Structures are given as C-alpha cells and as structure tokens.
A protein has these predicted regions:
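Extracytosolic ligand-binding ectodomains
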Residues: 1-226
C-alpha cells in the first residue's frame, strides 16, 4: 500500500472542495478519513458534489458511527465504510438485549454505537475491580486490574490488559446503508491485543502499569500539508 497524499484541516471546517479535488487528482484507490464531528458533513457533501462513486473510490472513516449518520445525508454516505469495533447491527443475543434495554430507557429512535459500547464495558470492568479489591481506593483498584479482568459485552468479550490498562477489541468494517445503519463486511476472528503506542507512530514509547507506567520516547510530530 502506498500513501499518495494527506491533508489536515481545522476541526469544524466545512469546505472540502479543494481537498476532494486533490484526492481525485492523486489517483487514490480509497480514502482513509480521520475527520471528526460536523466536518464530516462538509467532506461527504463535497464528495457527492464531485460525483464520487463509493464503488470506485470508497471512503473508510474512523470516527463515523450510527449517531453521526443521523446528521449526514444518506444518499451522500451510502456505500462508503466505517472502521470500528462495534456496530449496532451486530447480530448477537447479547447485543440485541443491550439495544432493547437502551431503547427502553432512552427511546426507540436512539441508536447505539462504538463510542458508547466500550464505555459500558469499562464501567463493568471497573465494577469487577472494585468488588475484587473490596475498596474504591485507586491503588487497590489498580492492583485488582493486574489480574486481567474480562467482561462479555454487547460487541463480544473483552479482556483488560494489566500492562496497558486498555482492553482487547474486535475489529470490524461496516458498509453504510441507506437506513443509517451498517452491513458488517469484515470482522476479526478474535479480539486484538491493545497497542496504545504503536512504534510506527510512537518510536521509543511503551507502557507497563504493572511496573513503571509510561516510558516516553521522542516527542511525536506530524508531517503533512496543513
């Protein structure tokens, strides 16, 4: 895989006309979209205006979930993709029960999504640690974390890694549907281990909360067009 270009725009920017033209001129086969928040509306509006066909130039977004799709135009995003650990359309009994309970509490029109599901799991992992420690004190709870707790969540069973204090996660790719939901087109066979400081991005950095915590390497800089 070759990266043929990259661009960084201010958070909240809505004008992506020039950026989309650069994408088209680059000859890219796909787009990795790390845009956040309302800027996604500007990006997909510009893509639609340029008549970008997701079958020929798909966009893979890292921060679009079901709730974000409620504010986007279905015709502009249908056929593009999201990279995520959880989708509401996951067809498991645990997920269906969770969605039903969520809708009973907040209404049938509300949706679940990836930003929400790990929070649910983490609260339950913290609860396990508190019960195991028999205390709310921070150090006692951290000590309980060292036993490698796990929780069967809506997106699958996750395990807390004592060294990083991050959890294992499934990886999934979803294709956006016209009803603002996702068809899951790929899923990892097993949960992936956490890697909060990948060496390609954080050379020399590491973390081990069972010993010395975070080991810092060189300060990270971003090279690219602004």
């Amino acid at each position: 895989m070759t990266v043929v270009g990259e661009a960084y725009l201010p958070l909240g920017d809505r004008d992506f006309t020039a950026t989309v033209q650069r994408i088209l001129d680059s000859g890219a086969d796909c787009v990795l979209n790390t845009v956040n928040g309302t800027s996604n509306l500007g990006l997909f509006t510009a893509l639609a205006a340029a008549k970008v066909d997701p079958a020929k130039l798909p966009v893979f977004s890292t921060s679009i979930a079901e709730d974000e799709l409620r504010s986007l135009v279905p015709e502009q995003v249908r056929g593009h993709y999201a990279l995520s650990c959880y989708f509401q359309s996951l067809a498991t009994s645990a997920n269906r029960r969770w969605i039903a309970g969520f809708r009973d509490e907040f209404g049938f029109d509300r949706v679940t999504g990836d930003p929400m599901e790990p929070d649910w799991c983490l609260v339950h992992l913290w609860k396990q640690a508190v019960e195991k420690a028999g205390s709310f004190e921070t150090e006692a709870v951290r000590q309980a974390f060292r036993d490698g707790l796990s929780y069967a969540g809506p997106g699958g069973t996750v395990r807390l890694d004592p060294k990083t204090q991050h959890t294992t996660k499934f990886f999934r790719i979803g294709r956006i549907r016209g009803d603002r939901q996702f068809d899951i087109v790929h899923a990892s066979e097993a949960p992936l281990d956490p890697d909060p400081y990948p060496q390609i991005a954080f050379p020399g950095w590491s973390v081990d909360w069972t010993t010395d915590g975070i080991t810092r390497g060189p300060e990270v800089t971003i090279d690219g067009d602004v």
